[in-house]
């Protein structure tokens, strides 16, 4: 009985130590890159595949933009959003600031469809740059990433300034993109 207990304790301690060291390795990997570190490896460029119709909405989806109006949105002062809505999309208007949903969210599955301007103007972060903020803290980057070199943690679909996307699957400027 004592021998079994000792073996059990040794195995348990070994498993806990292995889990601790593994977590430290992941933490060290994240900490070895500075924010916007130009030497951080870029994710591979992949073909996004053919554009097609969007998949059906999940039964419990909350649609925040119907293509018709900004009724689910307000500006930073909790006033009606003043972005432009036309042809089924919304577009930021210079000087109107950011917008946010009226409804608050915690855990969610985010689906974003977006397009950058078809006329290429600027480079790096100055080219079709926007983002989706989660909980006023984390930004999921929206950026023209097609043939546009920038730092890894600032690419389209990155958690801006923190973690790069796994791949760069950006389409050409002006084409609709999406990510989940």
Say what each PLM segment does.
Residues 1-4:
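Positively charged n-region of N-terminal signal peptides that target proteins for export
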Residues 20-180:
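Carbohydrate-interacting regions of secretory-pathway proteins
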Residues 6-7, 44:
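General helical structural elements
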Residues 8-19:
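Bacterial N-terminal signal peptides
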